[in-house]
Amino acid sequence: MIRLASEQDLPAIAAIYEAILDHEDATGLHYTGWQRGAYPTLDTAKGILAAGTLYVGTDEDGMVWGSMNFNDWQLPEYAKGRWTIPAEDSEVAVIHTLTIDPKRAGQGLARQMIAFAEDSARKQGKTVMRFDTGTENEVSNHL
């Protein structure tokens, strides 16, 4: 199930951030470009929660396996990009900081989060979806 996050979800979300960074350290593959202690952190999640744009994926028992910041905010650099599908800001939905617990990788959970975001964007009248990730993030770019 994918739903808006609550304050009770914050420790699990922060633990997933740390698990991803631990996984990157263990494998030597630093694909996210994230910096431990700088981004993302518990405070990052708190800010996104306060904005009302933090979503979580959970098992039937409520165990959090992933999160994302889903909104319509774009980095200023996006205005300079050469997009395959040009769009006005009002037409665009954006996924930021998509996370899946590394222990749950390969189960199609990120695709579930993206499908949820696409459906939500359509319901909001958005015509374009953008994924805020770096070009070096091969894992996310593969999605």
For the regions a language model picked out, list residue spans one by one:
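Conserved GNAT-fold acetyl-CoA-binding loop/helix
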Residues: 14, 18-44
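Conserved active-site alpha-helix within GNAT-family acetyltransferase domains
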Residues: 111, 123, 135-143
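Conserved acyl-donor/pantetheine-binding loop and adjacent beta-alpha core of acyl/acetyltransferases
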Residues: 69-97, 105
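Conserved acetyl-CoA-binding loop-helix of GNAT-fold acetyltransferases
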Residues: 100, 106-119, 142
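A short beta-loop-alpha structural element at the N-terminal edge
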Residues: 1-15
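A short helix-loop-beta-strand connector motif used in the catalytic cores of GNAT acetyltransferases and
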Residues: 41-56, 73-77, 94
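Conserved beta-hairpin
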Residues: 51-68
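Conserved GNAT acetyl-CoA-binding A-motif
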Residues: 114, 121-133
